[in-house]
Amino acid sequence: MRYDVLNLILGWTLLALLVPLGFCGLITVWLDGWELALQAFLPAMLISGGLGAAMLGLFTRTDSAQRLRDLEAFVGVGLVWPLTVLIGAFPYWFGGVFVGPFVDDALLIDILRGFVNSWFESMSGFTTSGATVLSHSMSPNCIPGTTVDCINAQPRGLLLWRSLTQWLGGMGVVMLGMLVLSRIIGGGMALARAELTGPSLSRLRPKLRQTAMALWGLYLMLTLIEMLALKFIGGMSAFDAINHAFTTMPSGGFSTRDASIAYYDSSTVEIIIIVFMFLAGVNFTLMWLMGAGDFKAAIKDEEFRTYLIYISVAVVLITISLVLVGVALGQAVLDTLFHVLSIGTSTGYASADYASWPGVARIILFLLMIIGA
């Protein structure tokens, strides 16, 4: 095991986190004021930057023969994620989303519990799980009986950070790091194998770094298109459109509202999100090839065909079950499409109370939850 290479991986990852932390810090200055920005993001940036610089200081540059090997790649990926989650938890904790060291008259046990909650929220974000502990009983920003929407009561800059963690986690923090590491030392493919799931890693470009840039470019483009669609077609506020675009493309499901997409009560918003949830469930390599005109790749791709089949079958069966209990056909199709894609891609948005749907519909959704995972 070459620990200097591990220090390089971890060090550059910690330094790379300064970019999203700094970005959200600046947005917090604009939307919530200097005091909160300094309180929430400055400590996280100092910790991340200090640790990153210290680890890079321990790195001894290797020659071309000392490329990144599978052993260092797998260990590095295993260490990057918890370290990233730890740094990602600090803005919630220091910023008062959960009880932290800057909350007045807080007990030590509550501060420790607040750190655990912050860790949970960060882990859920970076892994795109979408579960949340933001509630009236957990957040000091939510007053029971007074605050109607607990999530929306949080500072804007910290909600943006929450959504951005899902966006970064969706393509993979390590995938982003490959853009840097594959240039500094060799062996980027080893890091990719350690990070990415699936039977193979297709190269869209001659070099792995170019492939990573191509995929991130596609990811960014789709995110921007969804932002614009939600804002100018769906009628969302700019802030909500940005946040929901950040959490749709990674199939994350964080929302700025307790009621999720149901809050907007808009068929237009639901249709836009349906389109992008479907795209988020498609292999990005395949989307790139289709964008280049290679539609035969989609026809031949077994994964894509299976995706279409199980989504289509689920939509037909659940729609029939809803129509049989008196739901109008158009509404049944819309609700079914939304929740089949939301659950089938593990996004987790909700636009209706599907717990009240017929038993057969709930069973199908449960099976989709397993398949989508």
Where are these regions (language model features)?
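Membrane-proximal intracellular helices of multi-pass ion channels
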Residues: 1-373
